[in-house]
Amino acid sequence: MSVRMGLIRKKADWNVEDFRAYWRDKHGKLAARAPKLREYWQNHVTDRLQRGIQFARGPWDFDGFSQLSFDDQQQADRAFNQSDMAAALIEDENRFIGHLHIVTAEQRVVVPVPPQEERARLLKRMSTLKRRPDVSEEDFRREWKIHGDYVQKMPGVAGYRQNVIVARELVKGEPCGYEDLPIDGIVELWFEDTETLDAAFSSPEGKVTMQHATTFIDEITAFVVEERRVV
């Protein structure tokens, strides 16, 4: 499964409520027409606090994350670069989006996410990760996989997915290098509520987990989001 993720910043002259409504009610229906699309989720940012973590934040200040799942990256590229809807999608994005970065990720499920009815009641946090400058891409991926074993032992984790970034577009449609968009991974974590999240990271298991994180991660930029399934 290949996941195409849009890292979205609204236009400065749009308020948060109008941005969310347009993305949800108008743009979502257009993007849902992408051929071969398996799933489409919108994640609306509601909080930017570094709950439970002591890492520096990166420069990112997103208002939302889109997640569109395809069988492979080639299907995603055709849908958004070669299909009949591609031009219409860009035209609509220019109405309400100020900045849009695109990343393609290989998704790894560490703690399975509950069924949708239960999932809808949970708190979700997404975080972008940047590796330490002395850690290679290969070593980062290896250590992050090991890190998943630590997270599994933390109390209260209702779901956990790792999205390993394999392609980047600082400007949509223009592939770029790591230096232009230095994000190595995107975390998805689900908890019952903020109290459960705080308790997980302050637990002995949580402290061990975050100590391991310091061995390969330089920046963690956390966002609490409200997720909505479109497809």
Question: Where are the regions that the model predicts?
Answer:
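Macromolecular interaction modules
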Residues: 1-231
